[in-house]
Structure formats: C-alpha cells, structure tokens
C-alpha cells in the first residue's frame, strides 16, 4: 500500500484521513499527471460524496483539465463514460462496500482499467511535492454535466440477448446502481421487483452483498416465486446472487458458473482470478477448457492480467467480475444482465450450482492497525511455514500455503485496518482445525509487531 492509495484507491473515514483538502490535492495531482485533456467523474450515494467530488473537480479544473460530471453514477457507468466521451481518465467517488462513514477516490485509465499501484505512486509523489500545474485564468478547464445511462443501457442490450422474460428481485442497497440496474433489467424484458432502490447515504442494509445482508432479498425471491435475486454494493462494481429457491449463491460457486458460461459463450481460454479463490473454480472449469490464472487481490490486478493474457473472463470471489469483451471496469450491473442470459441459455441457477464442486471455505478478519501490518506479515510468513505442513507456496499477495486438499491465505486488507485469513479444505473438521491454528498465529503476530 502507498501513503494514500490502498488496493482499491483511497478509502478512509470522511473528515478524518479523507478530507476536502486531500481530495483537492488528488484533483491537482491527477491534472498535473495528465498534463491536460478530459476527465469523467461520478459519485455514489454517500452523504460526503458532493464534498469530495467538488474538491476533486476544483483541483482538476485548476490544472487546465476539462471535467465531465456524470453526477450520481455507479462505477460501471463511469468506466463506460470514459470510453463514450473519449476521456483521458475517470474518477469515482466511492467507498464501495465500506460503511457509510467512509468514502474514497478511485482513478481509472482511458481503457477503463483502474490506475495501477505504480501510477498511484506517481500521483502520491506529485501530491507530496506540491508541484502542481497551475493553469492561467484563460486556460482553466471547463466543466459540463452529462448522463450516459441511456447509452450504457443501449450498448448492453446489443451484447446481452434474452429469448424469455423473467422475474428479477433487485436489491440496489440504496447505492448508485439504483439509477441504472433496474432499468437495464426492464429493457431486457424482465419483470423487476426493486428493494432498497431509493438512493441514500443512510444504507438500510450492510453494503457487502453476502448471505447475511441479503436475507430480505432471499425472502422476497421465495415469496414472489422469482427466478433470481440480484444485489449490488454502494457503487455496483459487485454482484451478489440469490437463486430461484431463495438461497444465496456462494461467491465461489457463482464465480465458477459465470466463468463457465463465458467459456461456453466465447470458447476455451484463460480465466483470471485472485489468490483467495479456491479449488472449485479450477475443478469446474477444467473440463470446459478453462485455464485458471491467479493474481493479487484487487480488480486492477485482475484487469491487468486479462489484458496481458487475452483472458475470456476475470473475477474475484467477492462478487467483483470483469468482462473484457465489455470493459475492464468491474461491473456488477452488466454482470446482472449476463446472469439472466446464463439462466436463459442453461436453466435455473439452483440446478446449475449442483454441478460446481463444494468445499469448506472459512474466512476471518482480525483487527490490525495499518502501521503494524508489514511487521505482522513478516512474522506470519515466518511462523506459518513452521506451523503448517505444506507442499505449495504462493506469495504474490500475502502468503498462501497449500497441501493437497487444503490451502490457507494470510493477507493484510488494503482497505481496512484488518488482517484477513481465508482457507479452504475438503472436510469441515479439517477446516475448523486449520482456522483455529491460523487465528492464533495471526493474533500472536499482531501482538508482537
């Protein structure tokens, strides 16, 4: 992690570390880095969004950069608008699935991919130097407002085709996805039942679309006898899915299903995922001609590998999917349309999910101050190799150790002051045993850091 940017841009509590002053610096630094041109900016529904967005815009304009403000806009719409308007970069004001007191700044390249860590380090260097470009009064950037949502929907309709109509329960989580996702589903010919569709920074449910937060969605699917339930986080870069029986579909299972559908749709090829993805993905995709490539956690790492290898699909076991034939921006809205196309072609998700191997996956979050993370990881890496009998080791992001029918990943969060443990085993008893050892190891390492 850098001084300001983590694994998913800047993401901090508003008016603590993320202040209008810092946002102004980001705008000035980005404008200086670009040296001119045009930038698209949008925000999610957080109460601090206008404050941060206005500061970033001011910084950009002061360097002579033209700004297109698309207002309340999910991250996928910002990524689409960058290409639509021929912009040199994009900015999303969002903290994605974090609690409402957080906000963030994420910067996107002209191709829709997030800024790499190297590019973010350059922005940080400019921010700290204070050596910003200063446009004279007659060369200040121009500001205009636009709404690319209709163009987004029309473009998506050319890509996704349904032969039948379905009942879809859609939970936007009071986030920015509410201004696009329900409308796309209706244009596809589906009957849409909306939950939490009013844009608000006072979120009704936890934003991360998981089994716990989507209990109301699951119940509604059952009561309404819907074909599927779809949910988004605050900026709709993620998707959560509830099947036709009203059961939340685990991230790993859904990732396997949609990756398999993409292989059927576009032919065999490379599927990019992250080090926290389990064995099921490999086992399910191998017969379909899929070669799984693992990389660091974060959509920018997935997008980068997709671009390098010409991959068919990329995704994380967190509901973050990238469809390279569409864009290199993670897109939960377009993903929702693809889920309906998969159902239309292959059948109900409850039946499809039976084909995906099921292993026991456990996750834990251990509080860890950001300043202790580096030292704690040194201790964890050293002690883990002594504690566990392992056959394989992956250290591209944290440390992942493997031994036949199990694996454990230790990694510091890039967006929160926590240490993450993710593990998978074929047997539940073994998984619990491993997690017990792993949690004790991490807590001890943090106390010694």
Curated annotation (Swiss-Prot):
SUPFAM superfamilies: Phosphoglucomutase, C-terminal domain, Phosphoglucomutase, first 3 domains. It catalyses: alpha-D-glucosamine 1-phosphate = D-glucosamine 6-phosphate. Keywords: Isomerase, Magnesium, Metal-binding, Phosphoprotein. The modification Phosphoserine is found at residue 96. Activated by phosphorylation. InterPro entries: A-D-PHexomutase_a/b/a-I, A-D-PHexomutase_a/b/a-I/II/III, A-D-PHexomutase_a/b/a-II, A-D-PHexomutase_a/b/a-III, A-D-PHexomutase_C, A-D-PHexomutase_C_sf, A-D-PHexomutase_CS, Alpha-D-phosphohexomutase_SF. Mg(2+) binds at residues 96, 233, 235, 237. The active site is at 96 (phosphoserine intermediate). GO terms for biological process: carbohydrate metabolic process. CDD domains: PGM_like1. The keyword Phosphoprotein applies. Its cofactor is Mg(2+). GO terms for molecular function: magnesium ion binding; phosphoglucosamine mutase activity; phosphomannomutase activity. Its EC number is 5.4.2.10. NCBIfam families: Arch_GlmM. Catalyzes the conversion of glucosamine-6-phosphate to glucosamine-1-phosphate. Does not display phosphoglucomutase (PGM) or phosphomannomutase (PMM) activities. HAMAP family: GlmM_A. Belongs to the phosphohexose mutase family. This is Probable phosphoglucosamine mutase. The lineage of its organism: Archaea, Methanobacteriati, Methanobacteriota, Thermococci, Thermococcales. The gene is glmM.
